[in-house]
Amino acid sequence: MNLTAKLANRPDDHGLREGYLLLADISGYTAFLTGTELEHAHEIIGELTTLIRERLEPPMRFVKLEGDAVFCYAETGTFREGERLVELIEACYCDFANRVVDMTRATTCRCGACAAISSLGLKFITHHGSYVV
């Protein structure tokens, strides 16, 4: 029996689905952590990943946070037009960029982590196709 047939026989909540997979990843994360004070670095990354998750969910469904990467999915019907997903990504990116600017301006700390906030960026990887929950 092939994989598609096996998945088709599974309960609906664990079967093969069509939809969007999205990974939002903070760029500059590794250099940021290795070159700065960890206490403030973890607080900064935590605040930024929380912002990303809150901006994407809903309509996306959160799956996992892996370090600096937020992984989400949405079934095909969530976005009637693909442009809506692009708009969600754009809004998330703008919120992230604005938060980085706000954090940079608001800090009075001179530690390496706080001084390097502006070096962080955000990139997205998205795919539409079949997946298993």
Annotate each language-model stretch with its function.
Residues 91-97:
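Acidic, glycine-rich loop-and-strand cores that form catalytic or ligand-binding grooves
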Residues 57-84, 99-133:
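Catalytic core of nucleotidyl cyclases, primarily class III adenylyl/guanylyl cyclases
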Residues 3-88:
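Catalytic NTP-binding/metal-coordinating core of nucleotidyl cyclase/transferase enzymes
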